[in-house]
A protein has these predicted regions:
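N-terminal hydrophobic targeting/anchoring segments and the immediately downstream early-domain regions
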Residues: 1-174, 223, 227-387
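Distinct, well-ordered alpha-helical segments
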Residues: 137-141, 203-213
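Substrate-binding cleft of carbohydrate-active enzyme catalytic domains
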Residues: 182-196, 200-206, 235-243, 315
Length: 387
């Protein structure tokens, strides 16, 4: 029965390790001026805000959310390219783990994720979103590896010194820069996963030529469902990622999942903007608040739903096979745009239930939940150790 299948999904969510390629907790806490003091330290354990905390992660069976050390593109213009911001976000995550040693632990390898899972702790592996803080010095890769960074998203919303971004239109390097080629090779040598979410198509193909280890897309979805949205991966890219042994971790943001939802929300945004312009108001003006509230009541946001996330997973399986897909929610990073049924980390069982309904086996579910990502991480580590 349906009720039994739901219980079974919940059981599997807790039986298997669930990884999530991208959770933006660090930056969300930074925006709140989070400090490592007693009254703040409870936030990562239990909070009504945001999409992630310990209690909800336990409920949903999430075991290893990659904490995003996010460096906004504006930091590329700073003298240190955002290195001090990266340091402070890393310290925040290590501080949270130190403050709650019974609940959280930093994880530097798949073996540590597995050990933490056995003792009921949530692993906090770290990935850096935007390679800007490497600056122009390859030695910074070792510096960040030693601080615990295990993947680097080569760029974010703008082209940087390493490569071009899918959100930018300038094609500064027409893909990977000469320095970027060295960065990829050195990441392979150190055992840092190369993350191709956010990069332009030509960057992706350039990286494929150079990498000697499997790649990840930490939080990207399938372009088939969002034609023209360069931030998602095309069918050809997904196939090639599979041939490389890599894994695409599906982003749960509605705009990444469904072009109709994306277009509807964009339409609403334009309507609201026109309404405010008419009154000569900015969205941040106090007089705008009631207008915005009324507009949102009459034109509620559209959301994708959990079935569409499963459609994206199905599509990757069709193109590349069951070994090349995982979860990369972007929780705490996509704002109020999460699908119905996947509003926070407590709801992973809803997605597992949807996959079970489609005939995914227990072995399949285990792979999608986390085994695929841990395999890639192990392979990346093994390549580095063979040097």
């Amino acid at each position: 029965t349906d009720a039994e299948l739901k219980l079974y999904a919940d059981e599997l969510a807790h039986k298997f390790i669930i990884t999530d390629g991208h959770v933006d907790l660090p930056y969300r806490l930074r925006m709140k001026n989070f400090r490592l003091e007693r009254e703040y330290l409870g936030i990562p354990v239990s909070t009504k805000e945001g999409d992630f905390d310990y209690e909800r992660a336990k409920k949903g069976g999430l075991d290893a959310p990659f904490m995003s050390i996010y460096i906004p593109s504006s930091y590329q213009l700073q003298p240190d390219f955002g290195k001090s911001l990266a340091d402070s976000l890393i310290s925040m995550i290590t501080g949270i783990a130190d403050a709650h040693p019974d609940k959280f632990a930093i994880a530097l390898s798949p073996a540590e994720v597995e050990a933490n899972f056995k003792t009921g702790k949530i692993s906090l592996p770290m990935g850096m979103e935007n390679g800007a803080p490497i600056g122009n010095d390859l030695a910074n890769l070792k510096y960040f590896f030693d601080k615990g960074i295990r993947y680097i998203t080569l760029t974010h919303g703008k082209d940087n010194q390493i490569c071009d971004s899918s959100y930018d239109t300038t094609a500064t390097s027409n893909g990977l820069s000469a320095f970027g080629e060295q960065v990829v090779a050195e990441m392979n040598n150190l055992g840092i996963m190369v993350d191709i979410s956010h990069v332009s198509d030509s960057t992706f193909y350039d990286v494929l030529k150079i990498t000697k280890a499997p790649l990840i897309a930490s939080h990207s979805s399938c372009r088939k469902f969002t034609p023209g949205f360069q931030r998602n991966m095309s069918d050809d890219m997904i196939k090639k990622l599979g041939e490389n042994g890599g894994v695409i971790q599906i982003n749960f943001g509605s705009a990444f999942l469904d072009s109709a939802v994306r277009a509807g929300n964009e339409e609403n945004r334009k309507k609201l903007q026109a309404l405010l312009d008419e009154q000569g108001l900015k969205a941040t003006d106090s007089l705008a608040a009631p207008i915005i509230e009324q507009f949102q009541k009459e034109n509620p946001s559209l959301f994708a739903d959990v079935k569409i996330v499963a459609d994206h997973i199905d599509h990757v399986v069709t193109l590349a096979g069951i070994d090349h897909v995982g979860f990369g929610s972007d929780f705490d990073g996509v704002g109020d745009s999460l699908p119905t049924g996947l509003k926070d980390v407590s709801q992973f069982p809803n997605l597992i239930y949807e996959l079970l309904k489609r005939g995914y086996s227990e072995a399949d579910i285990k792979k999608v939940c986390g085994a695929n990502v841990l395999r890639v991480w192990n392979e990346v580590q093994a390549f580095a150790q063979s040097k």
